[in-house]
Amino acid sequence: SAEDTIVADQEEDGFDYDPHSWLDPISFKAQTEEVLGILIELFPAGNETFTANAQAFMLELDKLHIGYDAAFGDSGTCSNNIAAANHNAYSYLTVRYGVEFVTVHGLDPEGEPSAADIQKVIDKINEDQISVIFIEEYTQASSVDSIVEDTGVQVLYLYTMEKAPSDSADNYLSMMNKNLDNLLTGLGCAA
């Protein structure tokens, strides 16, 4: 439903448009409902199968949301909700769950950050005593070597799912659960 969808284009909060809406299970659930409606409209004979599959998936999304909310929601177990990341792909997590990210790159992870951009991240890591920098699965850890050397942060992975997973056994739910585990580990939170 519309009230469940977050628009991460909130310039007052410093967000540029972030296309990574699937990283918020509630927004992804709303998208699933939209796709279900279109599939039923285009292929009415598949109504029962589409509906059963979508409902099962949306239940899994609800469980995923419960896990993230239990960790990072208003009464979540994680009080340290600030981390560093190489790429600004996480504004939906910020808006939904309050996990904040200081990022080296903006929305384009391929761009080359300036020395001033890197120094801002280093200063913020030191100021907020951030202990982890998250990079994406296909990003080389060496890309953040200077930050690691200057701050001693740990490098962990978050999956943005912009590309197919390197492990063919992974799917959206397994990768989102890995993200939750890595966030909990990296932020030093109780599970």
Predicted regions and their residues:
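Extracytoplasmic metal-acquisition and chelation regions
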Residues: 1-191
